[in-house]
């Protein structure tokens, strides 16, 4: 018999009082007193499986929510333009019937929109998802293309040029609706982990790749040396004697080693990306992970400005703050927006800005008001100004100035340093700080969304060409998503 408890802890069921807190006692009470049968309780709680084989007639459109993302994309974008881009890749009068190229592109867009890691998994998800089938124009009984068919087409049929055309077509659609704002462009790079094991690697000696601006730089170096009465450098353009040792993956030779943190390394690619103030990705250049931002900048910048000549401001982080990048942007008639970059040097020593350059006499004045005279211009484009050791060894500030054995201080000044000074003047101009601060909500947000929501943290494809196509398709899908949400 159930013990009596306070009223608030008891429950009246069928005229009988049971305890609220003790399900075991409650069930025992009900079971032995016959107030509620066990089958009746199961009938209230259990969902049967009798309907699994039941046949129904329904309309797929009714099962896709009105506010579903794919509905918005289908309304905003006309994918029939893809037929024109791939028309030359198909033969109209021979061969077996092919899969619809628009369906293939839509399936890959679904993969990138929802961050599905593989094409095999993508086909499985589409096979069971009503909204995905509705987006493709397939009924629930229609057979989907095999995942190998999609893979083969994007590996062999659709080239980098085809994917680039699709990417720019999406941008043209956005620009046609006045949603693209290319006046200020935000540039940065992000690393993508490659499908390669760090243990499968070899050491290789390769020739040092010449930078695009080296020829122009050498001309100005020789001109400066000639003005100072020095001999010109005679460099052979075909000289391949300069080499460097690199770590190469045997799995994916196109990727490069990226130092992730102080002790961790990984094979990776880097996506050098540009976007506008609304977060629409305007262009991307994929390089191995060991290529510095400033090295990949020139070719990528030329292509970007050719596509969008209305660019006025180029916003970049400290990785792009080099004389070559500053010269490239300023000479093109645009304004580089760069941050403050802390100077290198030992603590307690004089900073580079403590040494004042006298343009009229072409010399440098040290903090102790002594003159450092011009010595030479080296092959890297730096003019060297050196002090007199006899004067320096008696200087009371020698310890703060230099630790060289011969007590001689050398100050380096790049022949394009005037462009760096212009970037500092621009940095202090009204409105530039606010413009630079928008990086976190534009380009950094693009990278965060791509990695967290769209599966760009690592890639399963291999080779620079395939990774480039993979990244462009992912960014095209992100642009389509943003465009559809803005026009909804």
Per-segment meaning from a language model:
Residues 133-137:
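Short arginine-rich
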Residues 66-109, 114-115:
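Basic, short loop/linker segments at the boundary and entry of helix-turn-helix/winged-helix-like folds
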Residues 36-71:
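Hydrophobic alpha-helical membrane-insertion signals
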Residues 7-9, 13, 21-22, 31:
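Polybasic, lysine-rich low-complexity intrinsically disordered segments
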Residues 41, 46-49, 108, 115-128, ...:
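Anion-binding and metal-coordination hotspots
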């Amino acid at each position: 018999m159930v013990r009596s408890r306070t009223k608030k802890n008891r429950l009246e069921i069928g005229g009988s009082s049971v305890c609220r807190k003790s399900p075991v006692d409650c069930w025992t009470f009900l079971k032995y007193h016959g107030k509620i049968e066990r089958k009746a309780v199961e009938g209230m709680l259990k969902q049967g499986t009798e309907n699994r084989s039941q046949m129904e007639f329904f309309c797929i459109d009714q099962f896709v929510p009105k506010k579903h993302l794919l509905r918005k994309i289908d309304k905003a974008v006309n994918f029939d333009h893809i037929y024109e881009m791939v028309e030359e890749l198909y033969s109209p009068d021979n061969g077996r019937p092919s899969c619809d190229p628009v369906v293939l592109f839509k399936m890959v867009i679904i993969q990138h929109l929802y961050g599905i890691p593989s094409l095999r998994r993508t086909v499985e998800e589409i096979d069971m998802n009503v909204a995905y089938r509705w987006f493709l124009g397939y009924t629930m009984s229609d057979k989907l293309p095999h995942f190998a068919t999609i893979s083969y087409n994007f590996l062999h049929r659709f080239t980098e040029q085809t994917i680039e055309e699709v990417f720019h077509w999406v941008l043209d659609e956005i620009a046609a609706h006045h949603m693209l704002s290319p006046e200020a462009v935000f540039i940065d790079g992000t690393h993508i982990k490659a499908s390669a094991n760090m243990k499968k690697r070899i050491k290789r000696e390769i020739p040092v790749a010449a930078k695009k601006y080296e020829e122009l730089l050498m001309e100005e170096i020789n001109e400066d040396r000639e003005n100072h009465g020095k001999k010109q450098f005679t460099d052979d353009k075909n000289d391949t004697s300069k080499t460097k040792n690199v770590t190469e993956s045997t799995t994916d030779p196109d990727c490069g080693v990226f130092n992730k943190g102080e002790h961790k390394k990984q094979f990776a690619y880097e996506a050098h990306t540009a976007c506008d103030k609304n977060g629409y990705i305007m262009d991307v250049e994929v390089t191995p992970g060991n290529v510095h931002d400033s090295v990949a900048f020139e070719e990528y910048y030329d292509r970007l400005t050719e596509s969008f000549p209305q660019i006025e401001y180029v916003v970049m982080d400290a990785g792009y703050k080099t004389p070559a990048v500053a010269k490239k942007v300023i000479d093109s008639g645009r304004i580089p927006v760069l941050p403050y970059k802390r100077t290198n040097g030992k603590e307690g020593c004089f900073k580079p800005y403590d040494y004042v350059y006298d343009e009229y006499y072409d010399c440098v004045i040290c903090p102790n008001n002594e003159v450092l005279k011009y010595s030479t211009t080296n092959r890297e484009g730096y003019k060297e100004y050196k002090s007199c050791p006899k004067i320096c060894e008696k200087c009371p500030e020698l310890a703060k100035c230099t630790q060289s054995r011969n007590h001689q201080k050398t100050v380096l000044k790049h022949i394009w340093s005037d462009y760096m000074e212009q970037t500092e003047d621009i940095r202090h101009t009204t409105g530039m700080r606010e413009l630079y601060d928008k990086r976190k909500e534009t380009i950094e947000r693009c990278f965060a969304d791509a990695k967290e929501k769209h599966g760009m943290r690592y890639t399963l494809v291999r080779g620079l060409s395939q990774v480039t196509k993979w990244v462009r398709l992912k960014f095209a899908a992100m642009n389509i998503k943003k465009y559809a949400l803005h026009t909804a």
